[in-house]
Each structure stands twice: as C-alpha cells, then as structure tokens.
C-alpha cells in the first residue's frame, strides 16, 4: 500500500504471529510503504479501542511522510485476547519487540496515547536500541497527579464499565475522553460497544486491569525510570484531560532529560482526535517528516 493509494481498513490490514510465552497473533495496519522512515502508532486502552479507530484522523496524513504501522495492542482490536498475562505494558512491549523482529525493523520512533504511551515508554526502556523519538499523548505510567484527585474521573468510568459493561456506561466513559462532546456520536458509541462487549474483549479488559495489581506491577510505574531515556521525547497533553490530568505531566517533564511539553487548550484526553490537524503537523515536524 503506497502513500498515494486510498487507505481503507481492509487494504491496510495485516496480521503477524509473535511469541510471548506462546504464540500471539497481532493485527496492525500498514500504510506509506516505500517511505524511508517507519513510525509505529500505539492506541489507548479504553473499551473498544483499536488502532484504526483511535488514529483514523492521523494514519493517512502521516503516511504521506512515513511508513506507518498502527498496531492493535494485545487484547484489543483484532489482536489475540488472553485471559492472563503479566504487567500489561511489559507484555505489550514484548509483543511489539516480536513484531519488530519479524518485520526486520531497527530503531523506530513510537507514537502512543494513554495506555499506548505507556507501552511505548516500556518498550524504549526495555529495548533502548530499538526505540527512536517518542511522541506521548497523555501517557499512562508517567502521569503522577500532583493536584488532581486519584483515581481520576476517566479511571472511575473505565472501572464502572468493567463491572457493568453496558452501552450507557461506555458512552459515559467516552464523553470523559473529550472536551467537545459532539465528537461522541451514536455511531462511534455503537462501533466501540460492538468491539468492547464481546466475551473475549471483556475478559481481556479485566486481565489488563488486573495486571496493574500483579506481582510485577512496578513495571508500570515508569515515572521512576524515565530518567534513563536518551532520545528526544515530545509530551502532548490536553488541558482538559480528565483521565491523566495536565498536572501529571510535570514529573515526566522534569525527569526525562530531553523532554518537551505541548499543551492544547479546549482539548481532552484524545489529542490526536480533537486537535488532529495540529497534532499531525506537530508530530511530522518532531519526527523529521516536515523537512
């Protein structure tokens, strides 16, 4: 699929099998084949999340400049959904390492929002030779609330859906994701609920949540380790983020040696959706595609 062809779910859809304590099927989208620089996109962890929907306003634009791989993280989209696994970010980073090996990728920039940002950081810490520049949007594992209450409104809504997975609870969760509530259309809610409400997805969601309280939970506390990152890191936050509030960015900004922070006003947790045009330009420039 070249950068000039029309991009659809079907035309970009790919599968790979990697080994993480046994075979694990990963689904991903590929676009911009032929461009020199590969960029990997990692979606967030809300119910019904997947790479195609989370990056629907970004893939085609980024593919004009980069070879884009938008990966469904384990337990999401069309990737395998296990009922048990270790700390999620480390588990997902191991799966991503397997995909890198299978595709023959070297050092690659990573773009991750929320849970995907945490996976990107875990990957960069565990496999430093394979991770290039990082673009992190409201990333999990780095956000330490200095002023906002914890758990946040978004985390509470996520927990409520896990306990009672209804369409109404999903819509309430999605509305917390954004500043502009008009973005949460009935069609989007239906699409996300169809993905989130299958028995396999519900099992995977609970396994993901449980993994943050397991014996290896400290692998998710990456704010304690990010001083080791040596690549440039772009932190992007929505001022009205109610999942990982803006004050949570300050520890990461202070600790990551080559970090910079960009904040969008009138924007919630879904920066790449609400401010897609500005986000795309900022990301392209930071990753070198604007030259």
Swiss-Prot record:
Keywords: Aromatic hydrocarbons catabolism, Hydrolase, Lipid degradation, Lipid metabolism. Its EC number is 3.7.1.17, 3.7.1.8. GO terms for biological process: biological process involved in interaction with host; lipid catabolic process; steroid biosynthetic process. The record marks 114 as: Transition state stabilizer. GO terms for molecular function: 2,6-dioxo-6-phenylhexa-3-enoate hydrolase activity; 4,5-9,10-diseco-3-hydroxy-5,9,17-trioxoandrosta-1(10),2-diene-4-oate hydrolase activity; hydrolase activity, acting on acid carbon-carbon bonds, in ketonic substances. The keyword Lipid metabolism applies. Pathway: Lipid metabolism; steroid biosynthesis. Gene3D superfamilies: alpha/beta hydrolase. The active site is at residue 269. It catalyses: (1E,2Z)-3-hydroxy-5,9,17-trioxo-4,5:9,10-disecoandrosta-1(10),2-dien-4-oate + H2O = 3-[(3aS,4S,7aS)-7a-methyl-1,5-dioxo-octahydro-1H-inden-4-yl]propanoate + (2Z,4Z)-2-hydroxyhexa-2,4-dienoate + H(+); 2,6-dioxo-6-phenylhexa-3-enoate + H2O = 2-oxopent-4-enoate + benzoate + H(+). Catalyzes the hydrolysis of a carbon-carbon bond in 4,5: 9,10-diseco-3-hydroxy-5,9,17-trioxoandrosta-1(10),2-diene-4-oate (4,9-DSHA) to yield 9,17-dioxo-1,2,3,4,10,19-hexanorandrostan-5-oate (DOHNAA) and 2-hydroxy-hexa-2,4-dienoate (HHD). Is also able to catalyze the hydrolysis of 2-hydroxy-6-oxo-6-phenylhexa-2,4-dienoic acid (HOPDA) and the synthetic analog 8-(2-chlorophenyl)-2-hydroxy-5-methyl-6-oxoocta-2,4-dienoic acid (HOPODA). Belongs to the AB hydrolase superfamily. HsaD family. This is 4,5:9,10-diseco-3-hydroxy-5,9,17-trioxoandrosta-1(10),2-diene-4-oate hydrolase. It comes from Mycobacterium tuberculosis (strain ATCC 25618 / H37Rv).
């Amino acid at each position: 699929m070249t950068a000039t062809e029309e991009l659809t779910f079907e035309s970009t859809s790919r599968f790979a099998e990697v080994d993480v304590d046994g075979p694990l099927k990963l689904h991903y989208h590929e676009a911009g084949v032929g461009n020199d620089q590969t960029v990997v996109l990692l979606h967030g962890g809300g119910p019904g999340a997947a790479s195609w929907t989370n990056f629907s306003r970004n893939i085609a634009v980024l593919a004009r400049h980069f070879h884009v791989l938008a990966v469904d993280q384990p337990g999401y989209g069309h990737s395998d959904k296990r009922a048990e696994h270790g700390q999620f970010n480390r588990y997902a980073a191991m799966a991503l390492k397997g995909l890198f090996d299978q595709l023959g990728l070297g050092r690659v920039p990573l773009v991750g929002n929320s849970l995907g940002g945490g996976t990107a950081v875990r990957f960069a810490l565990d496999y430093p030779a394979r991770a290039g520049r990082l673009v992190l949007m409201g990333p999990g594992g780095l956000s330490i609330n200095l002023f906002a209450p914890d758990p946040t409104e978004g985390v509470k809504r996520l927990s409520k859906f896990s306990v009672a997975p209804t369409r109404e609870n999903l819509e309430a969760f999605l509305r917390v994701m954004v500043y502009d509530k008009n973005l949460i259309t009935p069609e989007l809610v239906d699409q996300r609920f169809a993905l989130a409400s299958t028995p396999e997805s519900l099992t995977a969601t609970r396994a993901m949540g449980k993994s943050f309280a397991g014996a290896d939970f400290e692998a998710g506390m990456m704010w304690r380790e990010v001083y080791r990152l040596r690549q440039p890191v772009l932190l992007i936050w929505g001022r009205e983020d109610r999942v990982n509030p803006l004050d949570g960015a300050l520890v990461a900004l202070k600790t990551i040696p080559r970090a910079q922070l960009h904040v969008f006003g009138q924007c919630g947790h879904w920066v790449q959706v609400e401010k897609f045009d500005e986000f795309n330009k900022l990301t392209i420039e930071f990753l070198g595609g604007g030259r």
